[in-house]
Amino acid sequence: MECPYCQNTSSRVLESRSTEAGQSIRRRRECLQCKHRFTTYERIEFVPISVLKKDKSKESFDRSKLLRGIVRACEKTEVSAQQIENVVEEIEARLQQSPRREITSQEIGQLVLQYLRELNEVAYIRFASVYGEFKGITDFVETLNQLQQEERESSSSPEWSDAGEEATVIEDSSQVMASS
């Protein structure tokens, strides 16, 4: 590794640690000639993944695009930046581990929804509203009702059933309009 200060190629590694969920290695080095210390990163070079979009065009997988979409969905929620980064890393790792080098944007969207559903319901609905291309309030209400139904089925908390405070499922969009 070439020293960024004196360009000498001899250095010694002082410390190494895994970063980015094991996807890279951070090394702290010291130049043997000028004694300056510097940090280097070793990253795995992945085979590029192509994303097949709805309009049948292809583009290279763009991690920053995935991150932006998830950040936008998680705005003003309790989801931390670290949690968002973890989701992006996990999705990217799953894509890289797949033997397929071409994936549809719909498949990526489904992966994001799986993670957001566990992380935060508001972020899930926000992402679903863009990804699912809701045509109107009816689509939105149907997704909310589905979430609510699944939550009821998975909830076995005695406090919930004893409290009698079960939320009302909205049956049609006219009720939403009237209550607004």
Curated annotation (Swiss-Prot):
Region of interest (Disordered), residue spans: 148-180
Compositionally biased residues, Polar residues: 171-180
Cofactor note: Binds 1 zinc ion.
Keywords: ATP-binding, DNA-binding, Metal-binding, Nucleotide-binding, Repressor, Transcription, Transcription regulation, Zinc, Zinc-finger
Protein name, as recorded: Transcriptional repressor NrdR
Coiled coil, from the record: none
Lineage: Bacteria, Bacillati, Cyanobacteriota, Cyanophyceae, Oscillatoriophycideae
Source species: Gloeothece citriformis (strain PCC 7424)
Chain ranges of the ATP-cone domain: 49-139
Example GO molecular function: DNA binding
Family under the similarity heading: Belongs to the NrdR family.
Gene Ontology biological process: negative regulation of DNA-templated transcription
Zinc finger (unnamed): 3-34
Role description: Negatively regulates transcription of bacterial ribonucleotide reductase nrd genes and operons by binding to NrdR-boxes.
Cofactor(s) recorded in Swiss-Prot or TrEMBL: Zn(2+)
